[in-house]
Amino acid sequence: MAKTFDVVVIGGGPGGYIAAIRAAQLGMKTACIDDAATADGKPALGGTCTNVGCIPSKALLQSSENYEHAGHQFGEHGIQVKGLSVDIAQMLARKDKVIKQNNDGIVYLFKKNKVEFFQGRGSFVKTGADGTEVKIAGKTAESLLAKQVIIATGSNPRALPGADFDETLILSNTGALAIPDVPKRLGVVGAGVI
């Protein structure tokens, strides 16, 4: 027997989780399905932006700006920093902490607004007079029946022909946000927000 909802949102990125929360705030019984998970299997809500895009890139940018300020601009204020160095592992750990705080914040907002979350991959089964049936493949196999379905499945990086991502020499945004050392040379193709 399928659980019944007014709205089911497939995708927990910025478009999906905001749509789910707003639908619930407007009084609709709402569910959200997303398959992104952390290394320990917990929900990684927030999509590309939160997990491997805007948020982590800005967290690393802030760390690098602080390093730059300490090395060049603090002196103008009479602050001398001796033995300044970069700890990439700590920068990456901080980035991961920022991501987790954002993931946990979305889970909290779902609970606060009574959005029922299902971890897994949603797919359409059939549409009938009662609504659309969506099957969830994930930790549990469940079916949901919804009057309305919002598809907010986000985006994926696109490799150039003949230059597939190997995350060693040719990096996607995911690989670029986990580089363990500062590269001596780096070329960037693309001009997206990440």
Where are the regions that the model predicts?
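Beta1/beta-strand and adjacent pyrophosphate-binding region of the FAD-binding site
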Residues: A2-G15, V182-G192
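Mid-domain beta-loop-alpha active-site segment that forms a flexible
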Residues: I106, V193-I194
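Glycine-rich flavin
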Residues: A2-F5, I21-M28, C32-V182
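N-terminal glycine-/charge-rich "phosphate-binding" loop or analogous flexible N-terminal tail
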Residues: G13-A19, A23
